Amino acid sequence: MQSKKEYSLFFIFGTILFAGIVLTQGNKPDLDQQSLFDQLQKESITELILKTNLEQIIANANDVDYGDGKLTFVNGDTSNVVYDIKVKPRGVTRKQICDFPPLKIKFSKTDLEANGMDGYKTLKLVTHCKEGEDFEQVLLKEYTAYKMYNVLTEKSFRVQLVKITYEDANQEIEPSTHYGFLIENKQELADRIGAELKEKDNSILTQIDANQYRLFTLFQYMIGNTDWNLSKQHNVKLLIENEKISPLPVPYDFDFAGLVNAPYATPYSTLPIENVKQRFFQFKGNRNTDFRSTYDLFNAKKAEIMCLHTDFNLLDEPVKIEMTNYLKAFFDLINEHQVADEKLSLNGAYL
């Protein structure tokens, strides 16, 4: 589906040019060396062509096996770059709901090394889910939510907006073009911030980094997202920075957030809210925790956060207005510290 809108975006990451760099020896990739994701990062949209057995992916969303494919990076005036890849459906809820599931793309380490890149072999691709303008807007809103967390902290998943043409290898399905976005590899995130992934290790939850936890929970409240759980590590990655003992929570998957408001999103039945547009604060900790420094950070970054959607030309104007009003209610609350402290209690808060 081709969009008639302009593509100009005003986001924080600068264009990173392709460069050949020799791979160093060692167990971890060289941090001075660019990754595939580094080379994809730019202010404008990355154009891709994915050719694979689309019929197999769409009909068998629960398939855990990779299928063969080719991914072409469209470089405009220069030569296109084509990679042989493996691709499979991924996700949980979206894999069941979407007509076109999210995808996991795996590159050959040999190909990456041959092109002067380090060894982060997999990337997640968030897809359009279903046909139609409404679902395109949902995807763009979720992308914007990731960018908002990037503004607040570098300890976050980077994302890259793409315009991707899907081609069926067997020519059984007509080619189609949609927006999507790629999510940074989790090991790359850990290496970038000098941390270690701690998956399936709940023993560390009692000593979670207090500053980052306040930021994490207040951000989830800002976007109205309750679809996360620390103890189950649901939609959260835990990382421990070098020489520290307190893990950092890093969120992902925001389609159930009120700010995104996906048509299929509903809150858990155990929560005292009727729809995802209602905020509920899920901070678990000392009732007397002082959030003022966290409020100050959000206020300092407010202009950048708001510009991410107001200056985003691919979002429809009614969507921008709705997002502005939703975020304004949050900022109005945190700027009334006494009221905010009463609402943001240990037992949750509504707004």
Role assignments for model-derived ranges:
Residues 1-29:
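Bacterial Sec-dependent N-terminal signal peptides
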Residues 24-351:
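Phosphate/dinucleotide-binding and metal-coordinating scaffold of catalytic cores
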